[in-house]
Amino acid sequence: MKALHFGAGNIGRGFIGKLLADAGIQLTFADVNQVVLDALNARHSYQVHVVGETEQVDTVSGVNAVSSIGDDVVDLIAQVDLVTTAVGPVVLERIAPAIAKGLVKRKEQGNESPLNIIACENMVRGTTQLKGHVMNALPEDAKAWVEEHVGFVDSAVDRIVPPSASATNDPLEVTVETFSEWIVDKTQFKGALPNIPSMELTDNLMAFVERKLFTLNTGHAITAYLGKLAGHQTIRDAILDEKIRAVVKGAMEESGAVLIKRYGFDADKHAAYIQKILGRFENPYLKDDVERVGRQPLRKLSAGDRLIKPLLGTLEYSLPHKNLIQGIAGAMHFRSEDDPQAQELAALIADKGPQAALAQISGLDANSEVVSEAVTAYKAMQ
């Protein structure tokens, strides 16, 4: 089996690329970073530090790389069995024209073997969004052929990959946590389902998308916001602070109650999942900075994201939410000189006051009880 993976950054190499290579798939990375491309093509291998209770070093080998803006990537799309991405949500639109050209070439060459495309991004139904961009870039006479022969498969991904702190200055070395989860929507594949050991197939992807968003992402963000307010440097430092830990665990239990109501998750299994997430935040090898995890507070306070969406669920099912409120208040306090959204948030609160600002960012009713609760909590933190 041959695969092309867009994005040779830390997540591409340390997560999806590694899982594909470990499965014995012939893997080519596509990227714009010439230093990384040259290193991959010189060595055809790289090292991944996998850290948890212990640390081990795995070598990923037999890999190649091409520029994501040249003809090589178009040629590969015409030939491979699988295309994956880890480029970040904003970049999906930029790689769509190259994918479209490759699909046209595939059609022209008469290659009717199924191709499946999986965007592995930290977003909901990212592949469906990528499909929209690809379809817009396709000529009309290719669209029906693509619908017939190409599967656009949504996925949910979870692995903490902190920014590289390589002591060797090796552009390819990467550190990842032991935990990884790659769940894909098996209803969207064309042809036979692939046999990739680390890929989990489901016919209810949204349950797992929301489980991750409401637990890992919610907990990570609240740990960062409360940790920064308390003067902690890393996620580990913050989660070892008993006061912060109690709020983070409480918030994940509140959002978990929504998931259990909505999707029928087993309560004991979900409690164990929460404990596993807390353990991941404690990982001493992941020097994950609270400022990095907290950045983009406007996005994280928006209606469909990790703080407001679970809160809306608690309102829908009349469930408690006092810890989620603490997290939202903490997010409103987030300040960072390096983050434009943090500066915009501060300006908005200074201009409109916390009540109107939160309502504008989150879509919540300014006169609602929850906004009032969040503003009270926000003021109590000053």
Swiss-Prot record:
Presence of keyword Magnesium: no
Biological processes annotated in GO: mannitol catabolic process
GO cellular component: cytosol
Residue numbers bearing the N6-acetyllysine modification: K269
E.C. numbers: 1.1.1.17
InterPro entries listed in its UniProt record: 6-PGluconate_DH-like_C_sf (IPR008927), 6PGD_dom2 (IPR013328), Mannitol_1_phos_5_DH (IPR023028), Mannitol_DH (IPR000669), Mannitol_DH_C (IPR013118), Mannitol_DH_CS (IPR023027), Mannitol_DH_N (IPR013131), NAD(P)-bd_dom_sf (IPR036291)
Binding site for NAD(+): A3, L4, H5, F6, G7, A8, G9, N10, I11, G12, R13, G14
GO molecular function annotation: mannitol-1-phosphate 5-dehydrogenase activity
Family that this chain belongs to: Belongs to the mannitol dehydrogenase family.
Protein name, entry field: Mannitol-1-phosphate 5-dehydrogenase
Highest classification ranks of the organism: Bacteria, Pseudomonadati, Pseudomonadota, Gammaproteobacteria, Enterobacterales
